[in-house]
Amino acid sequence: MVADPPRGDSKGLAAAEPTANGGLALASIEDQGEAAGGCCGSRDRVRRCLRANLLVLLTVVAVVVGVALGLGVSGAGGALALGPERLSAFVFPGELLLRLLRMIILPLVVCSLIGGAASLDPGALGRLGAWALLFFLVTTLLASALGVALALALQPGAASAAINASVGAAGSAENAPKKEVLDSFLDLARNIFPSNLVSAAFRSYSTSYEERNITGTRVKVPVGQEVEGMNILGLVVFAIVFGVALRKLGPEGELLIRFFNSFNEATMVLVSWIMWYAPVGIMFLVAGKIVEMEDVGLLFARLGKYILCCLLGHAIHGLLVLPLIYFLFTRKNPYRFLWGIVTPLATAFGTSSSSATLPLMMKCVEENNGVAKHISRFILPIGATVNMDGAALFQCVAAVFIAQLSEQSLDFVKIITILVTATASSVGAAGIPAGGVLTLAIILEAVNLPVDHISLILAVDWLVDRSCTVLNVEGDALGAGLLQNYVDRTEVRSTEPELIQVKSELPLDPLPAPTEEGNPLLRHYRGPAGDATVASEKESVM
């Protein structure tokens, strides 16, 4: 017995309309108003759009207001007029946002990578990792080449005398980081394999130098020490290997995998709460950094060409090169994808930290762009560690800039050395503010350029580093989108799934017997439609 379809009335009840497949669809009041051309439907559309993009709009407005507020306070006397106590209170909301984000970096990175590595079968893990590293390597090389080309074309360091005279006191040459190239790469290898996982959560290994008197001769001796700063590279490597080990345990590792997945989900709930505070923190972070600068106008006047070269390179790579790569492989609109991650991009600009932006980026690519959790939570932490397109581009521009300041010519061999060294050193660049400047000394030493001029780079790094971070996290997100597209196409072509996600929604009672239906460590071979899967059609992936 078929019931009569509901009929619309003047009180706003939905009316039934036939669909193409013979069914009935309910037309809402908004749809009826839009069909009639009334203004009510337009207002409702605008209201829904504002509600859906409220956080994005608030974040963009926060950046604009932060710049205006910072320039206004700077024009009224800046940090000197405020005094130390008022300045500390002025930047406190931004400091609070950084502390909230850094608080959840460690559990988020470790739990997401363990859960992600454990939810992929070994073959898919290797393929996804290889494609991700290839994408990161190619885009970093393209960014480095673009940086060198722009610096050679625009000649930002041509007016060396004026820049040295005006900004020479902005930093101290003695404080510039000086490290041998070999020791830098050895430190990178040491940090990949930390000797203590607990200390790796807040310290990393770094080589320093001290002069010793050996047989009447002053010799520079390398001395290893632990320095402040999370060794995120070592934690990433350990988490991936530990996740693979849990997968190898089979049913015995399911309970621990579910624990890490649940821990990760709880962390993402915290992220969703922090996101609504992000606009306030970003506004005061941007404003506070502008207020702390002594003379913003002078720096822009003297180093404007260098700043323009860096920002132009980041804009070209982020708005043209990366979207073009995404479009060529996915045939989808890349700018629609970028619109879904506007909030993390603005957060990256405000915090100047790829690691601090990681929680927001995970949530946005999953909810707004449809990237699967086991992909985003596996790829994005790796990208935040090894993918530094913005840093590589900035380092190449800075190296050519310093060469022009020093009036040293760059031949073909030196240019290739800059490209290769910038790409390699950016892999180990920490996802923290000013991380790129710390590795710039490696490039300068590789091509025998003076390290003293790094003080000029530090004078404007507060702005360039923010642009670098935006480009870095954009590359991470687009890489996750590309891998999601690759997985979708591969699963359609193959007769068996490549990715087997561990079901974290199972009840957390004592470890049950490995039943056939809910065991995520078994591959199910689908037969013809309607046929039941028998035990002989299942094969363990272990």
UniProtKB/Swiss-Prot annotation:
The keyword Transit peptide does not apply. The modification Phosphoserine is found at S494, S504, S536, S540. One of its GO terms (cellular component) is plasma membrane. One of its GO terms (molecular function) is L-aspartate transmembrane transporter activity. The modification Phosphothreonine is found at T495. It is found in: Cell membrane; Melanosome. Disulfide bonds: none annotated. Residues 335-365, 415-448 dip into the membrane without crossing it. GO terms for biological process: glutamine transport; L-aspartate import across plasma membrane; protein homotrimerization. Residues 509-542 are annotated as: Disordered. Na(+) 2 binds at T385. It comes from the Eukaryota. Residues 83-95, 155-225, 287-307, 402-414, 449-461 are extracellular. Belongs to the dicarboxylate/amino acid:cation symporter (DAACS) (TC 2.A.23) family. SLC1A5 subfamily. This is Neutral amino acid transporter B(0). The gene is SLC1A5.
